[in-house]
């Protein structure tokens, strides 16, 4: 699915600004790009590590006094149970696509979608993109799993929503409305999907 890495780094940037202002260590991250846990900083070889590898960075982050960890969780990891037994403070469902349909990942879109929905079985707060395909079903599943629900998208009924987007020479400018902050934001990365990723990062940060 597209957007996990971008959203993870948006969240990390937001959290690090706050953590720095509080005099605290920067947050840890496990992503498809690189990993940092307060002890090890390295390029990633897999989006979500195997279960026996996964707990070492958690321990390293804890021992380093790190209070927050941002993590990409792949649909394949959810399918095979790499994060089974974990509880995430916040999880976000960005979108559903065909990019992971293959003989070694998901045989079809239904399997991919069902795997992704397992995220909400492990979340205290679930954030859902209402502009994505199957949004109503995703929202219903998050609610049925007992998650506190935060929605984000282009609808005024969303918890975090974007009123308008303007493309300028130096990036995309958009107005955001939410319970905790309202105002104009901008990103330099092109593509409307990155506005959606930014909204996801705001929703996640708002829940923390």
How should these model regions be labeled?
Residues 4, 134-135, 158, 194:
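Alpha-helix N-cap/loop-to-helix initiation residues
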Residues 105-113, 124-125, 140-208:
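Adenine nucleotide phosphate-binding catalytic loops in nucleotide-utilizing enzymes
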Residues 2-126, 130, 136-145, 206:
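Phosphate-binding loop of NTP-binding sites
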Residues 131-132, 178:
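Heptad-repeat coiled-coil segments of the DHp/HisKA dimerization-phosphoacceptor module
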């Amino acid at each position: 699915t597209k957007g996990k890495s971008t959203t993870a780094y948006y969240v990390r940037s937001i959290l690090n600004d706050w953590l720095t202002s509080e005099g605290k260590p920067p947050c840890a991250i496990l992503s498809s790009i690189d990993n940092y846990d307060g002890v090890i900083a390295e390029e990633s070889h897999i989006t979500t590590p195997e279960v026996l590898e996964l707990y070492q960075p958690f321990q390293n982050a804890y021992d380093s006094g790190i209070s927050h960890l941002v993590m990409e969780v792949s649909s394949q990891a959810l399918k095979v149970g790499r994060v089974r037994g974990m509880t995430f403070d916040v999880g976000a469902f960005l979108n559903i696509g065909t990019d992971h349909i293959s003989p070694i990942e998901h045989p079809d879109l239904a399997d991919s979608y069902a795997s992704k929905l397992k995220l909400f079985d492990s979340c205290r707060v679930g954030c859902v993109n209402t502009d994505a395909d199957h949004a109503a079903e995703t929202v219903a599943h998050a609610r049925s799993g007992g998650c506190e629900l935060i929605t984000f998208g282009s609808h005024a009924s969303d918890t975090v929503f974007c009123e308008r987007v303007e493309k300028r020479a130096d990036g995309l400018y958009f107005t955001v409305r939410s319970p905790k902050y309202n105002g104009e934001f901008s990103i330099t990365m092109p593509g409307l999907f990155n506005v959606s990723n930014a909204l996801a990062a705001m929703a996640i940060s708002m829940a923390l």
